Structure formats: structure tokens, C-alpha cells
Amino acid sequence: MREPDPQRGEHSRSCAQRQGKSFRGYIAASLSLIAVFAASGAPYPLYERYRIEEGLSTGDLSWATVSYLFAVLATLLVFGQISDYLGRKPVTLAALVLAALGSAVLLHLNGMMVLILGRVLQGAACGLAASATQAYVLDTAPRHPTWLGAATATNVSQIGIVLGTLGGGFLAWSSPSPEQAPMLASIMLTVLALLLVIAADHDPVGRRSGAMTSLRPVVAIPQAARPLIVASAGVFISTWALTGFYQSFAPTISATYLGTRNPVMAALVIASVVGPQPFGAAVRGRIPVRKAQVYGSVTFAFAVSAIAFGLYRHSAPLVIGSGLIAGLSQGVGYTASVRMLLDKVTGDQHAGLMSAISMISYIGSAVPSFIAGQLSLVMFLQTIATGYVGLAAAGALLIIGIRHRTT
């Protein structure tokens, strides 16, 4: 009978211990990603209440959205690589602290500047999480199934926004302290995630020198990707513009055009566009990438048209149903466009290209939101929505025209 090999047994136990530490890190990182983005989604259903109770205008609300978006973008561009030098855990902890501080600021809102400060802090938290915490998830995900890490890293942030928005809407509706309850829940969730990250003693990236040099933004569109960037930018701008419109005005849309100030309805309106986007990314995998870009952008344009028509008809089912289709088609078109660009470049060019994609997307959301906010002072939102129809149609026609010219 063969004697057991003590060295092999010790090696197996060591591997199991490392896998256990890694899995705890994966759970902590995943919950952190949810917590940070849930905190950013929690205030959205309260925007109409802020407008009425604090005397804010729709223009003020759009400023809050623009400030949030630019905070995400600036943090992502400047600090996007910092966790490669300081480690995943410290930067994830910083993201959680910023998210909790943003929620704490919004606990006692008393004016526009407080709202903007809270949203900037939450935006900075999301910028750190979108880089460091997503990388933390990828680094600690179990090896099997092989798709789990990528699926978690790319989709959990959207899930967090939806959970935060729906949870914030429900708490604002059911709690005697509608403005405080969503923020307190967000703080509790971020503290729980923070404790789990501290307890997860495995950091997949050690501290090393060079952190200051990493603060230089790397934004580049490699030569090989440039023929595709115009069409892809049309998708990025038109789809993210609609998301920014909903983030700024969904509660006001619900109150003015759908006949209810219930924050749960406002949350459903926002979630109808944001929630289906990860499913659209999954659908894209079943469609050839070039066709997916065209199908996604054309379907998106029709869905935005239906949303605008639903606003004119004051139809909640049409607005929400069309929002679901818009979110799904956005996921299809956006991921197809990103995939087409990445397929044209080498691995060492991914970081600069992804920074360029992020910059186009966030600016494409922030600038139309700012313009819409100023127009909302003199125009009805349903009229402004037709401008987004034109933007979506322009994006679809641009893609069709470029594809027709190159075939």
C-alpha cells in the first residue's frame, strides 16, 4: 500500500487556504462594488422631493448630475491606475469611505451646493470603484467558472445602481424620514462592505513605487481603431445621453407626466433604462459584432421615440416599457462598439483606449444633461425629450451611413 505523501498534503492544504482567502476577497470586492454604486443610485428618487422641499429647479438637478458625472470621469482618468501601485484594498477602502461621506452629506440637504458636494463625493467613489474595485473582483474571482470574474466586474456596478435606486425609492416612500432613510441605508451598506474588505487579508496586488507617475491620464485612440471611432462615438454619446437625462429628470417626469410623486415610480422609471443594460451585453454575445452595433443603435432610436411619445401621452406603461427596450438595446450597441474597438488594438493599448471611451461616454452624458437642464427652465421636458430622439436617430443614421460606405 502506497504511503501518503505529506508534502503533497501540505501543498493541497496551502492551495485551499489561498483559494479561501481569495474567495473572501472576491465576496468583499463584489459587495463593495454594489455598495458604492448603490449609494450613487439612492438619491435619484429623491430629486423631485429636493426640488419641492429645497426650492431647487430642474436646472439645479441637472447641475448635480453633471457634477457627479465629471467627478466620476476625472477620478477615473487621474486615479484609474493607482491601485496597481498602492494595492486593491486601500483604494477600495477609499472608495467606500468617499461613498459613505457623500451619503452623510446628503443626510441633511439644505441647498444646491450641499447636493453638488454629496454627488461629487459619490462620483469620486464610483470613479475609484470602477477601476480599483473592478480589478479587485477580477483578481480574486474563482478560477471556475471562468466567466464569473468578468461577468461580476462588468455587471455588478449596474446592479448596484438599480438596487440603490429601487431601495432608495422604497425607503423614501415607506419611511417617516424619506430623505434620511435611503442615505442611512447606504452608509450602513458601505460600512458593512468596508469591514469585509478589512477582514479579507488577501490583497492580490502589493504596494510598489511609481504611484505618482500613474496619476498622469493616459487617453489614446490607437491608429488601428480610428476608422471605427466616429461610428462608435455616435453610440456612446446617444446612449449615455439618455441615461443622463433619466438621472436628472426621472422623478420630475414621474410627477409631471406620469401623475405620481411616489418615489418608487421614479425609481422604476430610472431602473427601466439602467437595469436591462447588462442583459443587453449578454444578448450581444449571440449576435455578430457589426450587426449588433447596427441593430442596437436602430432599436435604441425607436425606443427613445416611443419614450417621448409616452411622455406626450402621459402613459407610464409606455414610458417604462420603452425604457426597458432602450436599456436592452443600449447594452447591445454599446458593448458591440467597445468590442469592435478593442479587437483592433493590442493588449498594451487597452488602457488608453478604454480611457478614451470613458471620456467620450461621460462627456456624452454630461453635456446634454447640462443643456437639457438649462432648457428645462423655459421648455417642457417632453419637448426636450424630442431632442434626445434626434440625438439617438443621428447616432443610428451615422452608423448605417458609415457601414454602407465601407461595404
Task: Locate the predicted segments by residue.
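Helix-loop-helix hairpin linking two adjacent transmembrane segments in secondary transporters
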Residues: 144, 148-198
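Cytoplasmic helix-loop-helix junction between adjacent transmembrane helices
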Residues: 118-157
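A late C-terminal transmembrane helix in Major Facilitator Superfamily
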Residues: 330, 337-384, 388-389
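Helix-breaking motifs and short loop linkers at transmembrane-helix boundaries and internal kinks
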Residues: 55, 87, 108-113, 310-314
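Transmembrane alpha-helices of Major Facilitator/SLC transporters
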Residues: 265-289, 303
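Conserved MFS/SLC helix-loop-helix module at the cytosolic interface between two early adjacent transmembrane helices
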Residues: 73-112
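C-terminal transmembrane helical hairpin of 12-TM major facilitator-type secondary transporters
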Residues: 291-335
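Paired small-residue
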Residues: 102, 113-122, 317-325
